[in-house]
Regions:
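Short, structured coil segments at secondary-structure junctions
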Residues: 8-10
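Catalytic centers of hydrolytic enzymes
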Residues: 16-248
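Short, exposed beta-strand/loop patches in secreted or surface proteins that constitute
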Residues: 2-6, 172
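Active-site neighborhood of phospho(di)ester-bond hydrolases with catalytic His/Asp-centered motifs
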Residues: 1-3, 14-16
Length: 248
C-alpha cells in the first residue's frame, strides 16, 4: 500500500500505493538482446478524467440495491479495534473454536457507524474471500506465534505492534528495546490444548506456527459476518481492546 521505487540487489522493486491513485510505467531499454537499462515512474491519476463508459459501470455496481440493502444493524458505532474483535469472534464461533485470532491488517475499514450495515460494508471490511483455518494449540504455541510476529525482522511494517486481535485477553511483555519476551494469558491454562480459529492468511503466511490438526475449513469470513448480522441484530460491538503491551 506504499509508494516504492527502488533497486534491491539489481532488481527494480515498485509499488504504486493504494486506492488506484497511481499507475506504474516501467521502461526497459534494449541493446540488441541485452537489457541496457530499466526505469520506472509513478503516474498520478488525479488529473485524468474517468472513462464515461467504465464510470457508468462502476456507478451501477455501487448503486446495486442488493449490496446497499441493510443486512442487519449495529447498536453502536464500531471502531477498527471493535471490528477486529467482531471478526475474531466470528471466526471462532463459525467453527466452534474456543479462541479466535484475527490479523489486524485484514480489517480493511477503520469504522462502521451505528445503524444499518449493508452487504457492501461487510465486503469492504473483508474483500479477500478469506476462509477460516483451524488449529489445535497450547498457550505455549500461541505465545510463540505472537512473539515471533511481534519481533518479525522481515515484515517490519507488521512488527512491534499488536497484530493478532483475539477473543482471549493477553499481554505482550517487552524489553526496553521493544522486543517481545513473553505473552501472558490470564484466562488460559498452561499445557491445555485449545481449538483455535484464524484466517487462512495467518495459517498460510505466518512463520513459526506450531500446532496440531491444522486445516483450512470451508467457512468464509464474509459469510459468517453476514450470517451474524442477519440472525443476531442489533449487534453490540465491543470496542474495548483485549490485548496490550507492557514494558518489563
Amino acid at each position: 500500500h506504499e509508494e516504492v521505487d527502488t533497486l534491491i540487489g539489481g532488481t527494480l522493486l515498485t509499488q504504486t500505493g493504494k486506492d488506484l491513485r497511481n499507475i506504474g510505467v516501467t521502461t526497459i531499454r534494449m541493446k540488441g538482446r541485452k537489457v541496457a537499462g530499466v526505469d520506472f515512474r509513478l503516474v498520478p491519476l488525479a488529473g485524468y478524467e474517468p472513462d464515461p463508459v467504465f464510470q457508468k459501470q462502476v456507478d451501477a455496481c455501487y448503486a446495486n440495491p442488493e449490496l446497499n440493502r441493510p443486512m442487519g444493524e449495529f447498536g453502536n458505532a464500531a471502531n477498527k479495534w471493535g471490528l477486529a474483535n467482531w471478526m475474531a469472534g466470528a471466526v471462532a464461533d463459525g467453527i466452534d473454536a474456543e479462541i479466535g485470532f484475527y490479523h489486524i491488517g485484514g480489517v480493511r475499514l477503520d469504522s462502521i457507524p451505528a445503524g444499518g450495515v449493508s452487504a457492501a460494508s461487510v465486503y469492504g471490511l473483508e474483500p479477500f474471500g478469506t476462509l477460516v483455518a483451524e488449529m489445535k494449540m497450547t498457550p505455549a504455541d500461541m505465545r510463540r506465534m505472537i512473539v515471533s510476529k511481534y519481533n518479525d525482522p522481515v515484515n517490519v511494517k507488521e512488527a512491534h505492534r499488536i497484530d493478532l486481535i483475539s477473543t482471549t485477553p493477553y499481554v505482550i511483555v517487552t524489553d526496553q528495546a521493544d522486543n517481545a519476551l513473553d505473552v501472558e494469558f490470564p484466562k488460559l491454562r498452561e499445557g491445555k490444548v485449545y481449538t483455535v480459529a484464524v484466517s487462512d492468511y495467518v495459517y498460510k503466511n505466518y512463520n513459526d506456527l506450531n500446532y496440531t490438526d491444522g486445516k483450512i475449513t470451508e467457512e468464509d469470513v464474509t459469510g459468517l459476518l453476514l450470517e451474524e448480522l442477519e440472525e443476531d441484530s442489533p449487534l453490540r460491538i465491543d470496542n474495548t481492546p483485549r490485548q496490550r503491551v507492557r514494558r518489563k
